[in-house]
Amino acid sequence: MTASFKAVMIGGVRWYQQHISANTPPCCKYYPTCSNYAIEALERYGAFKGGVLAVLRLLRCRPWSRGGIDDVPQRYSVFYRFSWSKAHEEPRLTPLATTQREAQR
């Protein structure tokens, strides 16, 4: 049941990307965009936990926010942005994929 609900939620985000977001100029301050963040969170953590992370991301995306790189956390935590132990997951200047490639060199 949760897998089908997750698929419906991802379908809703993809519909938004194709029909609404495609017709407006890009304006998201974060990388990845809020809709891509939502899809990744839903795929990684499922409908409930991924949905919570997606809503929290939308609440962070406001006109007075700094923006930046804000990846889905590696371990689920609603409070990961406020935890000193997870400071390595704060928004970075380079994407996670680039950082991993450089570490392998």
UniProtKB/Swiss-Prot annotation:
Question: What subcellular compartments does it reside in?
Answer: Cell membrane
Among InterPro entries, the record links this protein to: Membr_insert_effic_factor_YidD
Keyword Protein biosynthesis recorded: no
Keyword entries, A-Z: Cell membrane, Membrane
- UniProt-listed Pfam families: YidD (PF01809)
Q: How does it sit in the membrane?
A: Peripheral membrane protein
Q: Which SMART domains match?
A: Haemolytic
Predominant location: membrane
GO CC field: plasma membrane
The record describes the protein's role as:
Could be involved in insertion of integral membrane proteins into the membrane.
Regarding protein family, the annotation reads:
Belongs to the UPF0161 family.
Could you tell me which PANTHER family the record lists for this protein? Answer: MEMBRANE PROTEIN INSERTION EFFICIENCY FACTOR-RELATED
* Protein name in the entry: Putative membrane protein insertion efficiency factor
Organism whose genome encodes this protein:
Bifidobacterium longum (strain NCC 2705)
